[in-house]
């Protein structure tokens, strides 16, 4: 069921109230009191709607209404309540005694809204205008890609930093420096090993030519260029450095140029005797009257002797003393 309208629209006056209409309404309410707004227009002799009479009395003609300018405290209360409640003027009017909701609404629209805009505050959200008015600009500025930056600025842009505000690429640079140092020290070590190999080649060549002095030990040649730095590098990069050093010590003790057992001339004589025996079995091919003792060490062809160095190395590897030393070092290594 719909509510019955308070009055019929025919013949009703609209618009501003006159002073005569205000006197009739005030005199009737003083005699009969408030209430019954539907019947008041007929009883008071007014051609107005009952709602219009009620609002005129509540907002203007009521004697306890406070009129005049709003104080600074009242303005602050209205602003704070509007930020939390919005446009609920009747609720705001309850916190301002003797102020009507209609008067508060009119004062907000005519004064307070303009005051907030002048201070740079949005009257709807009560936040700074710069915070809400430029969200698109902030999103565009925050979404600038690194490709749009100039090359000079992109070089100066630091990478992602860690929790202690230090760039992460510092750790990668330090690791690269360590790897470069290790590789450089490794190359130095390999160069020294190559130098040792060349010195061993010169020693064997000198033994073939017979120019090697018998008083020069092999251990002195091995220890000439090994400094403390090379030993430290060997310990750092070779996990079996101690075992290899043990093998070298045994080689120093067991292998000597002065030892007649490892004399290269005897090896050549034995090699020639073996070839002579093979020639006897096969029916010749070599001159049996030729003896190695008749050939001096200085008359031996150097090119042919260098080809037989492989045989000399095989002789060392097949020798019983050398095999015993290497096997003992292998057992010591496994024991460790």
From Swiss-Prot:
Phenotype caused by lack of the gene: Low levels of aliphatic glucosinolates.
Region (Disordered): 127-170
Keyword Acetylation tagged: no
Cystine pairings recorded for this chain: none
The entry's DNA-binding region: 37-61, 89-112
Low complexity bias spans: 141-154
Protein name: Transcription factor MYB29
UniProtKB keywords: DNA-binding, Nucleus, Repeat, Transcription, Transcription regulation
Induction, per UniProt: Slightly induced by gibberellic acid (GA), jasmonic acid (JA, MeJA), nitrogen starvation and UV LIGHT treatment. Transiently repressed by salicylic acid (SA). Accumulates upon mechanical stimuli (e.g. wounding) in inflorescence. Down-regulated by sulfur-deficient stress.
SMART domains: SANT
Tissue specificity field: Expressed in both vegetative and generative organs. Mostly present in seedlings, inflorescences, roots and stems, and, to a lower extent, in leaves (in midvein and trichomes) and siliques.
SUPFAM superfamilies named in the record: Homeodomain-like
Amino acid composition bias (Polar residues), ranges on this chain: 155-164
GO term, biological process aspect, one: response to wounding
Gene3D superfamilies (alphabetical): Homeodomain-like
Single GO cellular component term: nucleus
UniProt-annotated location(s): Nucleus
Subunit description: Can form complexes with MYC2, MYC3 or MYC4.
Protein's organism: Arabidopsis thaliana
One MF term in the entry's GO annotations: transcription cis-regulatory region binding
InterPro entries documented for this protein: Homeodomain-like_sf, Myb_dom, Myb_TF_plants, SANT/Myb
Functional summary from the UniProt entry: Plays a minor rheostat role in aliphatic glucosinolates (GLSs) biosynthesis, mostly short chained. Together with MYB28/HAG1 and MYB76/HAG2, promotes aliphatic glucosinolate biosynthesis but represses indolic glucosinolate biosynthesis. Prevents insect performance (e.g. lepidopteran insect Mamestra brassicae) by promoting glucosinolates.
PROSITE patterns referenced in this protein's UniProt entry, alphabetically: HTH_MYB
Alphabetical list of Pfam families matching this protein: Myb_DNA-binding
Ranges where the HTH myb-type domain occurs: 9-65, 66-116
Upper lineage: Eukaryota, Viridiplantae, Streptophyta, Embryophyta, Tracheophyta
């Amino acid at each position: 069921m719909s509510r019955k309208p308070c009055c019929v629209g025919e013949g009703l006056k609209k618009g501003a109230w006159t002073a005569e209409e205000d006197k009739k309404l005030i005199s009737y309410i003083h005699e009969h009191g408030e209430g019954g707004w539907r019947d008041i227009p007929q009883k008071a002799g007014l051609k107005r709607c009952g709602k219009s009479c009620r609002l005129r009395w509540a907002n203007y003609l009521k004697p306890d209404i406070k009129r005049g300018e709003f104080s600074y405290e009242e303005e602050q209360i209205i602003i704070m309540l509007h930020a939390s409640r919005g446009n609920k003027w009747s609720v705001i009017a309850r916190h301002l005694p003797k102020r009507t909701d209609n008067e508060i609404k009119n004062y907000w629209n005519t004064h307070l809204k303009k005051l907030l805009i002048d201070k740079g505050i949005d009257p709807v959200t009560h936040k700074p205008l710069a915070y809400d008015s430029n969200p698109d600009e902030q999103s565009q500025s925050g979404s600038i890609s690194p490709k749009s930056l100039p090359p000079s600025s992109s070089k100066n842009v630091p990478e992602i930093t860690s929790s202690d505000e230090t760039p992460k690429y510092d750790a990668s640079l330090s690791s690269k420096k360590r790897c470069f140092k290790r590789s450089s020290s490794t190359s130095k070590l390999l160069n020294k090993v190559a130098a040792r190999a060349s010195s061993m080649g010169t020693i064997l060549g000198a033994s073939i030519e017979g120019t090697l002095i018998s008083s020069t030990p092999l251990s002195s040649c091995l220890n000439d260029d090994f400094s403390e730095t090379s030993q430290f590098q060997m310990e750092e990069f070779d996990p079996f450095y101690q075992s290899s050093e043990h093998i070298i010590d045994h080689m120093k003790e067991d292998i000597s140029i002065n030892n007649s057992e490892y004399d290269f001339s005897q090896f050549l004589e034995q090699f020639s005797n073996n070839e002579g025996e093979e020639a006897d079995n096969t029916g010749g091919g070599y001159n049996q009257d030729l003896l190695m003792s008749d050939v001096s060490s200085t008359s031996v062809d150097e090119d042919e002797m260098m080809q037989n160095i492989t045989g000399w190395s095989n002789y060392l590897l097949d020798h019983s003393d050398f095999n015993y030393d290497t096997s003992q070092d292998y057992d010591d290594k496994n024991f460790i």
